[in-house]
Amino acid sequence: LELDIKWAIAGRNPSKLENVARNFSTNVEILVADADDEKGLKDICSRSKVVLSTAGPFHRYGSKLVAICIENDTHYVDITGENFWVKGLIEKHHKEAARRGIRIIPSCGFDSIPSDIGTFFAVRSLNKPVKRVDSFHSWKGEASGGTIETMFSMGDLNLGKDIRDPFLLNPEGSYTNEQKKLSSDVFKISKQKDLNAWSGPFVMAGANTRVVRRSEALLTERQESYGNNFTYQEYAFHKSWSKALLSTLGLGLLGLTLVSPLRKTVRSFLRKPGEGPSLEVQENGWFDCKYLV
């Protein structure tokens, strides 16, 4: 890194951390702690201004770290897509973090930076109030073992109906009946004439839409609303109806697998936490987002 920043890498396995550190030309300090090691986590947080966490599933490994960050006035950033867990963080820590001036910023990976920041800049580029933003996503890549574990682990949790709430992460009283009526999750295939393409359900929409709606609600509290009764929706982008159909069927099959008795059997054949796509797959991966405002 060319920036004048003192940084370190942390994890539970010193030898693996040393292998990672060899990839950097600068001296990188190595810090060792497990997600359940309160003493080790306190040592890391007490010495850090910001902690960036990539260790999921976060509902298993992230809660103690967030609490210790706040205790030590340390900002926290992660890549979770687990909105039910983020909801718990908001309920437990939002007021105290705000009082201390500490930033707790979940969902800073593929979910949900493109959606959240893309919507922000799309709206701001018009320099006027906006009623609605629709985003359309296409991508190429493979999931890591941690992401796969997160998806399959949710079947063991009693999440209830709240997980389907389009405004799960919003502050209480921050949305209207009109907004709620126009914000239901999308499961159908539709022709998008403005794009000369087709849209269908997007695998990350359930996570991303909640984050975008919360961001807009928090901006509204600062008198920086996107627009009166603003709504946001998200779709997968497809060039043809047949591709939209195949993708939607695949997504439906995945959903059925995650709630079926066979999920543990299927899980055993897939990547484990700590495993990921090959370097070739990573280097050839991409995503594209289009915004209709």
Predicted regions and their residues:
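ADP-ribose/adenylate-binding Rossmann-like module
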Residues: P57, V66-K87
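C-terminal catalytic/substrate-binding lobe primarily of soluble NAD(P)-dependent oxidoreductases
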Residues: R124-V293
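Adenosine-phosphate binding glycine-rich loop
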Residues: E96, R100-K140
